[in-house]
Amino acid sequence: MKELYKGFAHVAINTADMAESIAFYEKIGGEVTARSTAGEKQLALVAFGGLVLELIQPPAGELVPSGTGSIPHFAVYVDDLEKAAAAIKEAGVHTFTTPEKRVLPDTFGGLQNWFFTGPSGEQIELLQMF
């Protein structure tokens, strides 16, 4: 099954203040490579060599979602989202947090993803870019 994965994509971090977070990560050597929105959420990708952080700021007035902590998920790239999800289900994982893949044509240039839950409650994102 490991041949399905192309590599590490990113670690997501919730933030209450996008500008403050971007300033902090730029100050320590990060580079903002993309900014986007998902509904009313603000999103930014900050690169450090091979590591990418996805900063997520909830809509104005909303708190960071309860139970997700400051690191809500990590993501891995796949070439074929349907094939990867089928292989994971075949391996006995049935804790997908989204009932089907999500297609987001306007987020970071276009992507589709599917989330499932690991044994300790961690959220894992399968990510295919357009």
For each predicted feature, which ranges?
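Exposed loop/turn and edge beta-strand positions of beta-sandwich/beta-sheet ligand-binding modules
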Residues: G7, Q42, S70, G110-L111
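Helix N-cap motif at beta-to-alpha junctions
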Residues: D17-M18, V78-E82
